[in-house]
């Protein structure tokens, strides 16, 4: 059963859980981190899994953008809150369905998959995604064309 809770950013009560549960959170990106520390603060036992070697997901890409260095502090905050709230962190771990059977509930926060637009020539070797450039450090020429005008395109 799904229960929606409406909250305002200005006012949030973190009430103790009536029934404490053993929770698995799959994905240590922004959503998984926020859920894990809030659930643990309410008294749940939380295990946070991520297949990567560090927490943060897309924050680790964003922090590389000039002017977005505050994400380093965001990640420092989450690392500290994981310790303070007692969240069990399992990095470099691809969790299986069998392993998740040991938990009362599983929260999937497994992140995003970049969308590739259906454009002729998109598979050309000179066409790079933001992940190719920022995460994988692919070299970029002196002249570039950016496709897309969302947040990533502007950054």
Q: Where are these predicted regions, by residue range?
A:
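N-terminal Rossmann-like NAD(P) cofactor-binding module of classical short-chain dehydrogenase/reductase
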Residues: 107
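Rossmann-like dinucleotide/flavin-binding elements
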Residues: 16-51, 55, 90-98, 102, ...
């Amino acid at each position: 059963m799904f229960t929606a809770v409406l909250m305002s950013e200005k006012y949030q009560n973190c009430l103790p859980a009536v029934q404490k549960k053993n929770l698995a959170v799959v994905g240590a990106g922004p959503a998984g981190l926020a859920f894990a520390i809030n659930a643990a603060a309410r008294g749940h036992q939380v295990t946070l899994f991520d297949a990567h070697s560090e927490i943060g997901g897309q924050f680790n890409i964003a922090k590389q953008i000039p002017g977005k260095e505050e994400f380093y502090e965001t990640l420092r905050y989450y690392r500290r809150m994981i310790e303070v709230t007692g969240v069990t962190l399992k990095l470099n771990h691809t969790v299986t369905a069998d392993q998740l059977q040991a938990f009362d509930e599983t929260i999937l926060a497994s992140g995003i998959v970049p969308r590739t637009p259906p454009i002729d020539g998109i598979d050309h070797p000179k066409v790079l995604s933001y992940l190719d450039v920022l995460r994988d450090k692919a070299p970029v020429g002196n002249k570039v064309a950016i496709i897309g005008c969302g947040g990533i395109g502007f950054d």
